[in-house]
From Swiss-Prot:
Belongs to the DNA glycosylase MPG family. It comes from the Bacteria. It is an enzyme of class 3 (hydrolase). This is Putative 3-methyladenine DNA glycosylase. It holds the Pfam family Pur_DNA_glyco. NCBIfam families: 3mg, PRK00802.1-3. The keyword DNA damage applies. GO terms for biological process: base-excision repair.
Amino acid sequence: MDRSAQRIDFTQPADVVAPLLLGAVLRHGGVAIELTEVEAYLGTADEASHAFNGPTPRCEVMFGPPQHLYVYASYGIHRAGNLVCSPDGEAGGVLLRAGKIIEGLDIARARRGSKPADEALARGPGNLGAALGLNLDLNGSAVDQVFSGAGDSSPTSAPFTLTPRTAIPEITRGKRIGISKNADALLRFWVPGDRSVSSPRGRQLGTPLRASS
C-alpha cells in the first residue's frame, strides 16, 4: 500500500520501531541501503542486549538520545550498526541486519570486494556495516530523517540520513539468530522473499506481521 512518508518516532520501544524501518533507506558516504531485515533489542529488559547490565563505556550511546547510531565491533572484526530508540535514558536499539544497495553500488563493492553478489553486499550486520562504511568513530552519530528522496542533497549536517518508506512492505517476524541469550524472542523482522535477507534459515520460521503505518 502506497502512502506519504511519515516520520518515525524513535522514542517508541525498539520492537515498535523495528518493523517501521523495513523499506526505509539509510544513507551515508555515498551509499544508500534499503533496509530489509532488522532486529530489536530491549535494553535492560533484554538479556541479549548490550545494555542489559546498564550503561558501560561500550553501550552508553544506547542510553542517550534516540535517533542516533550505536556502532560496535562484532567479533573484533566487523562494525555493526543499531538505531537507538526509546526515550533518552532508557536503552533500546534496532540492529540493522540486512538491506539492498540502491545507490552507490560501486562504492559498496569497493568496500566489500568483488566476490559477493549484489544482493549479498549488505546481507548480515557486519556486511551491512562494511558496505555503509561504518567505523567506531561514527558511534553516537545523529541520524536525520529526510523525505521525498532528498538523501545526501538535503540540507543537514548529520552524517546519516534516513528516508522513511512510502509503501508498507510485507513483513515477517521470527526468532533472532546468531545469539544464545533470549534467542526465542520474536524480535527479528524482515521482508519475506527478499534475497538480501539472512540465508537460508534466516528467511524461514517466521509469521506474517501486519505492518502499522
